[in-house]
């Protein structure tokens, strides 16, 4: 177990990481591969247990209990990686002048600090919003696991990537599921409506009721008695569970409190350095080159680059074209590159079980693509053709 180590100048050599999600743990692993002795401290408000977050979209079809999702306990992870772990230790603030992390268990000096504070599920502001359920962590799932098991009528608010996955999963054992979105089609931030038609058909064939072009206005009722939901178009229905899947909002409170530059996320440069030269950020909380990147591959690549930077070899983050996977088993999708824009010309090949759609710019160059259904094997050859 590591202990705080002081340099000759009296400044801690310890790399302190706040958070224990995928980004934090991936960074620890990357650091350890490069340096077996570097002192590392992980501070987290939860247990620090490792689990696979994408599994949260498939808990019904896989019969997955919350406790069974744990791959490795926080204490075992700390022992394996030879780090100091402070579980169940909320961080109260950061003092960047004295280079201290302030917690309920004391003050901890750092040589370099990494914020891996993640993002929280967005909750809409409407009457009864406290009755909404979110599934953005193992802890959130554990809190509502019983309610999910008992629910027969479920409304999923938000038809983005996670909402579509959840709706198909929740309907996999015959439940009455409604998928609701203000947009006119699912995955509206990712794809033109035409390319989502096969997915819509697959959702309907699973028994999902698609309600587009309308939103949620209010939720009324009492726990245990079901919920009466009212839509913005005035229609009402009775539901046992209402799940919010309308996106994530980076957790910025600690960064703001420390005076770091933030916009939608914590602003970082190419080396994932914040506006403070001794503080870095990684994962869902980060805004890099104007983008939020709440996907696993950018985190893995970011952790590898940041580990080298923290250990003395400044390494900019470079992201190649990356696949986004929509894990809807009845009609899976993979996409990459630029897939939205009125200037795109689409060339589509369809069959009864799948599609390949290529997006080309005004010069006729491939700039994005979508593959669906039984055409998954076309993804990697197209990915290699995208400009880097």
UniProtKB/Swiss-Prot annotation:
Its main location: cytoplasm. Its EC number is 1.18.1.-. It catalyses: 2 reduced [nitric oxide reductase rubredoxin domain] + NAD(+) + H(+) = 2 oxidized [nitric oxide reductase rubredoxin domain] + NADH. Pfam families: Pyr_redox_2 (PF07992), Rbx_binding (PF18113). InterPro entries: FAD-bd_OxRdtase, FAD/NAD-bd_sf, FAD/NAD-binding_dom, NO_rdtase_NorW, Rbx-bd. It is found in: Cytoplasm. GO terms for molecular function: oxidoreductase activity, acting on iron-sulfur proteins as donors, NAD or NADP as acceptor. Pathway: Nitrogen metabolism; nitric oxide reduction. Keywords: Cytoplasm, FAD, Flavoprotein, NAD, Oxidoreductase. Its cofactor is FAD. One of its GO terms (cellular component) is cytoplasm. It is an enzyme of class 1 (oxidoreductase). Belongs to the FAD-dependent oxidoreductase family. One of at least two accessory proteins for anaerobic nitric oxide (NO) reductase. Reduces the rubredoxin moiety of NO reductase. This is Nitric oxide reductase FlRd-NAD(+) reductase. It comes from Aeromonas hydrophila subsp. hydrophila (strain ATCC 7966 / DSM 30187 / BCRC 13018 / CCUG 14551 / JCM 1027 / KCTC 2358 / NCIMB 9240 / NCTC 8049).
């Amino acid at each position: 177990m590591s202990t705080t180590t002081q340099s000759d100048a009296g400044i801690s050599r310890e790399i302190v990481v706040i958070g224990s999600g995928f980004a934090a743990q991936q960074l620890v692993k990357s650091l350890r591969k490069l340096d077996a002795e570097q002192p590392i401290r992980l501070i987290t408000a939860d247990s620090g247990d490792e689990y696979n977050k994408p599994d949260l979209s498939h808990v019904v079809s896989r019969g997955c209990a919350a406790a069974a999702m744990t791959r490795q306990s926080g204490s075992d992870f700390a022992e394996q990686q030879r780090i100091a772990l402070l579980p169940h230790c909320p961080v109260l603030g950061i003092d960047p002048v004295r280079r201290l992390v302030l917690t309920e268990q004391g003050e901890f000096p750092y040589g370099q600090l990494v914020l891996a504070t993640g993002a929280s599920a967005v909750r809409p502001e409407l009457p009864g919003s406290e009755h909404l359920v979110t599934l953005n962590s193992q802890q959130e799932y554990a809190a509502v696991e019983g309610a999910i098991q008992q629910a027969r009528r479920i409304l999923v608010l938000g038809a983005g990537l996670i909402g579509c996955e959840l709706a198909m999963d929740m309907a996999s054992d015959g439940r009455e599921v409604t998928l609701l979105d203000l947009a006119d089609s699912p995955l509206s931030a990712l794809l033109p409506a035409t390319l989502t038609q096969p997915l819509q058909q697959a959702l309907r064939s699973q028994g999902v009721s698609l309600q587009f072009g309308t939103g949620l206005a209010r939720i009324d009722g009492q726990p245990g008695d079901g919920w009466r939901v009212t839509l913005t178009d005035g229609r009402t229905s009775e539901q046992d569970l209402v799940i919010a899947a309308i996106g994530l909002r980076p957790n910025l409170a600690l960064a703001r409190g420390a005076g770091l530059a933030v916009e939608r996320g914590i602003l970082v440069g190419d080396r994932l350095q914040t506006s403070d030269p001794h503080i870095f950020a990684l994962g869902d909380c980060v805004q890099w080159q104007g983008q939020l990147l709440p996907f696993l591959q950018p985190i893995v690549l970011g952790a590898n680059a940041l580990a080298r930077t923290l250990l003395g070899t400044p390494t900019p983050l470079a992201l190649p074209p990356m696949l986004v996977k929509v894990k809807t088993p009845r009609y899976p999708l993979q996409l990459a590159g630029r897939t939205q824009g009125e200037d795109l010309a689409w060339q589509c090949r369809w069959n009864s079980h799948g599609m390949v759609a290529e997006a080309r710019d005004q010069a006729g160059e491939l700039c994005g693509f979508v593959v669906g259904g039984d055409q998954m094997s076309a993804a990697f050859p197209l990915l290699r053709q995208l400009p880097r």
